[in-house]
Swiss-Prot record:
Family: Belongs to the AspA/AstE family. Succinylglutamate desuccinylase subfamily.
Cofactor note: Binds 1 zinc ion per subunit.
EC number: 3.5.1.96
Protein's recorded name: Succinylglutamate desuccinylase
Pathway(s) this gene product operates in, as recorded in its UniProt entry: Amino-acid degradation; L-arginine degradation via AST pathway; L-glutamate and succinate from L-arginine: step 5/5
Function statement: Transforms N(2)-succinylglutamate into succinate and glutamate.
Source species taxonomy: Bacteria, Pseudomonadati, Pseudomonadota, Betaproteobacteria, Burkholderiales
Organism of derivation: Burkholderia pseudomallei (strain K96243)
Protein encoded by which gene: astE
Length: 349
């Protein structure tokens, strides 16, 4: 039988989950207890960790929190590692089943966004089309881990959550914003209120099925899922984590079951109306490198040219999000959105 002291030694690595992952190491044991035996943990593989209260109830929420799907987006990775540490020490009570995922450990170790292909474009089975990519098996592993985790979760609304944390390549008119996957159903008031609590200023609403991690968990696992963009890409150790305090606090309240947060204003809503798709390496994107996400453009403005392809603004005003001419041909080089705050808030389910 494992003694309390042995269990504590086996769980010491939980003080720095990030360091263990960056080193490519495995913990001394695959399962154990922490937080004075109040929490059970199980290491599920590189960058994957499940934590559950020792007295877990059948109707308890199941929450997946992920970061590092892009390996150079370091601030959310550091926040997630600190979350694990505080749960393991007993400083943060755990009142849910929690799956922690550091998405792309190989890219994290290399200090790169990805090794071969953007991992956040490979979910929903798309990884099968790129079998030679080093990201493909990781996408399949993350899908399997999420599906297994949620397979035993409750089915009531709000019983399943997925928060996928990122940072953006460029600045934004709204420094911290969220993206909600398209499910065919109106977005929920529960999610919008949680995002308001996290002081997220804007929400981008997808209108077609995507291949991101949060799209997969929403579609295949029935989770309330969102992608959070929490600032700009910085190297490990160079982040001012205080800038992310409201979002971090909202995640902590979610996993600890607290309901004492002051209600924030609902975020503004923006709906995708089109995208710029890179046809070839001849793409010209008429958006400067320092133009922030959500910058507005007036009707008629030419934003992109690629051979015979043109994209000009069709609505009175469209805002561009994630402009990136460096993506591979066939991929999205920018999203165009319009504000739909009033209608979106009125339709919240």
């Amino acid at each position: 039988m494992t003694s309390s002291a042995d269990s504590g030694r086996d769980a010491a690595w939980l003080d720095d989950f990030l360091a263990l992952t960056l080193a490519g190491d495995a913990p001394p044991a695959e399962a154990g207890e922490c937080a004075a035996r109040a929490v059970r943990w199980r290491w599920l593989g590189d960058g994957l960790l499940r934590l559950e209260p020792a007295d877990a109830a059948q109707r308890m929420q199941s929450v997946l929190v992920s970061a590092g799907v892009h390996g150079d987006e370091t601030a959310p990775i550091e926040l997630l590692s600190t979350l694990v540490r505080d749960i393991a020490r007993g400083a943060l009570p755990l009142r849910c089943r929690l799956l922690v995922a550091l998405g792309n450990p190989g890219a994290m170790r290399a200090g790169e966004r990805y090794l071969d292909d953007d991992l956040n474009r490979l979910f929903g089975g798309r990884h099968a089309q790129l079998a030679a990519s080093r990201e493909a098996p990781r996408a399949a592993q993350l899908e399997a881990a999420a599906a297994l985790f949620f397979s035993t979760a409750g089915r009531a609304r709000g019983a399943r959550w997925h928060i996928d944390m990122h940072t953006a390549i460029r600045a934004s008119v709204f420094e911290q914003f969220a993206l909600l996957p398209h499910t065919g159903e109106p977005p929920t008031r529960t999610m919008f209120e949680w995002l308001g609590e996290a002081q997220i200023a804007a929400v981008l609403l997808h209108t077609t099925k995507g291949s991101t991690f949060s799209h997969f968990t929403a579609q295949a696992c029935g989770a309330l899922a969102c992608t959070l963009e929490l600032g700009k890409v910085m190297p490990f150790g160079a982040n001012d984590l205080s800038r992310f305090a409201p979002a971090d606090a909202a995640v902590r309240r979610l996993v600890s079951g607290r309901r004492d947060a002051p209600r924030g204003a609902l975020p503004r809503a923006f709906t995708v109306v089109d995208q710029i798709t890179k046809q070839s390496d001849a793409l010209e994107l008429f958006v400067a490198n320092d133009v922030p996400n959500f910058t507005p453009f007036a009707r008629g403005t030419l934003l992109a040219r690629d051979g015979d392809y043109r994209y000009a603004v069709r609505h009175e005003q469209e805002r561009i999000v994630f402009p990136n001419p460096s993506v591979k041909p066939g991929l999205r080089a920018g999203l165009l959105v319009i504000e739909t705050t009033r209608d979106t808030h009125a339709a919240l389910a």
